Amino acid sequence: MNQNLLVTKRDGSTERINLDKIHRVLDWAAEGLHNVSISQVELRSHIQFYDGIKTSDIHETIIKAAADLISRDAPDYQYLAARLAIFHLRKKAYGQFEPPALYDHVVKMVEMGKYDNHLLEDYTEEEFKQMDTFIDHDRDMTFSYAAVKQLEGKYLVQNRVTGEIYESAQFLYILVAACLFSNYPRETRLQYVKRFYDAVSTFKISLPTPIMSGVRTPTRQFSSCVLIECGDSLDSINATSSAIVKYVSQRAGIGINAGRIRALGSPIRGGEAFHTGCIPFYKHFQTAVKSCSQGGVRGGAATLFYPMWHLEVESLLVLKNNRGVEGNRVRHMDYGVQINKLMYTRLLKGEDITLFSPSDVPGLYDAFFADQEEFERLYTKYEKDDSIRKQRVKAVELFSLMMQERASTGRIYIQNVDHCNTHSPFDPAIAPVRQSNLCLEIALPTKPLNDVNDENGEIALSTLSAFNLGEINSLDELEELAILAVRALDALLDYQDYPIPAAKRGAMGRRTLGIGVINFAYYLAKHGKRYSDGSANNLTHKTFEAIQYYLLKASNELAKEQGACPWFNETTYAKGILPIDTYKKDLDAIANEPLHYDWEALRESIKTHGLRNSTLSALMPSETSSQISNATNGIEPPRGYVSIKASKDGILRQVVPDYEHLHDAYELLWEMPGNDGYLQLVGIMQKFIDQSISANTNYDPSRFPSGKVPMQQLLKDLLTAYKFGVKTLYYQNTRDGAEDAQDDLVPSIQDDGCESGACKI
């Protein structure tokens, strides 16, 4: 190696390269790690040095050299690369490795306009000094490389134009805690700040992207997902697209319910004009969604919902595929098809489904969600009424078209609207659930707006976070984590701004939360359980019972302190009905685990004191945030032991947690013989979860005789999901062979899904 190379320092001066210095930094970064070779990293990086190289480029070269060595056999390179990257990050942010005092840092950032000046109004210098004693900057060293790159790319406060970074991770965590608990009484709030900081900085609670990147800055919109319902008038359609633009510009993903829009050829103003149908308006929504990237963090994304019995359904199901022409395709949104028991019954009996325009059949659209018996009565009545425009189609043909499009695009989602309303925290007669969100885990009431400032409409917001099951050693720990997650997210509802009155009204009235889980695959591996063989069923029952019980208990305690949410009377909880009362009883055949908690005492306490939050749980995908915690994604099985995530900051390799000890215990996605075991687990989770679950179906064509997945199998899995009370189905993944060779040259590549995911956490 040429010792005479000149390097250019950060201040512009030059000096001879100091290889000893590089060696010392590598030595420091490798301390306590297994099976990492410093000389390997040095060799790989030295060949890339050149005369006049900047010290920052030297640093980046070394980091990259270490990251390239991450593999199944040497997973600890992900920590070596991470420590080097943290060193580099802190140099960039602070000009030195040691972070400054918290108070000095906050003063400087507020002066620069990077942090919210409320921080200095809410807390004294003394309190900041106390918070400084809570911080453990060494926790930075527990990040994996993928986590540091995600922090750098998405979460740390920065100038996205120049690439300057202004903070490191522990300041992010303590200041999120400080902002969220700023309105708590002076005497208790620092204790909450410390407890919450400890839970998030040790990865026990995972926070969603909008909270991580936004809380502490002057932008105060942190809902991950927004649900907007559209009426069947031009005013409502325009109000919907205005609301979409407002929220997409503020980092949110969108769920649109466009199911009320009348069909092509319907009369307008008593026949004065001829309706252009749904597609032009869907295009209008697509343009609104794509008009802004999500606050510089993600591209806009939306899922649009419509009922299976809509007169135009055959044209709507194909909107995403690659055939057709620009005029009859709207490819840059995803779609959710809404189904209920009557549709499935027609399929099973080999009968027809009759398609209508919602505008021609009074009361039918509302009954589809609010009252299943009334829906069936009206539906059969309208089928017999010859004066109503309609079209009959064989149920099997319609379901097959839907499943074919789901298989080919992967992005046609399913919402079982009857399950969403019969096993719901809301009374469907007063507050029916008529749609879901971008990633299908949210199920909340909405009402169409007539204009963007309409006070009577309701936009639903989902405020998310998750428990990291991999970091939990006993279910008792969930009690404290539930208290912290519920209190922090509930405080967030008051802390954030609402760009649209209809959103503020719903958020303040219902105070809905969606707390989920990450690292479920690691949790199963640790307990020696598998997805596919039923061995995890009872453990899953016990775990999700504990999660929902402790969340309800925390919200009930908060209601005693701060009052129940104003619209508590619209929930089924107000009538003393709990998830354990309304679940699909078919689940009893696959999980015989008894209930372990005192639900009856909780029921009485909820009837007496109410709940602070109308909903508490939802199981969301978590591609990005689980990388921060070095966890597996949500409830999903991993595709490979090493995953490669393509993010805008390059290729990130991540090894599943504790691979060295547990590699035989993990069940990989494509090792599962089918979807049955997974769908059973989702059904068991849904017994307790009050909103919904982003559940995927997965198919490996090579497992079938002709190398093609038979339609019969797709329909069977759809019916299995319905049977076990599954409310929603998200992606359909088909194995294509390229992504899963498990040598380290071709690890599984995963994109960040849903346009880099928004109601993912």
Where are these regions (language model features)?
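A glycine-rich phosphate-binding loop feature that marks nucleotide/adenosyl-phosphate handling sites
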Residues: 44, 63-65, 79-87, 199, ...
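Catalytic alpha/beta core of large soluble enzyme barrels
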Residues: 124-150, 440-446, 489-494, 591-596, ...
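Terminal amphipathic helices with adjacent charged low-complexity linkers/tails
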Residues: 77-113, 149, 339-341, 420-451, ...
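Alpha-helix capping and helix-loop boundary segments enriched in small/acidic/polar residues
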Residues: 13-17, 164-167, 187-191, 211-217, ...
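Internal maturation/activation junctions in enzymes
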Residues: 199, 482-504, 508, 530-622, ...
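Core nucleic-acid recognition elements
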Residues: 1-3, 13, 36-174, 178, ...
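Polar, glycine-rich mid-to-C-terminal structural blocks
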Residues: 318, 327, 331-409, 417
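Function-dense linear segments that define catalytic or interfacial modules
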Residues: 157, 164, 171-189, 193, ...
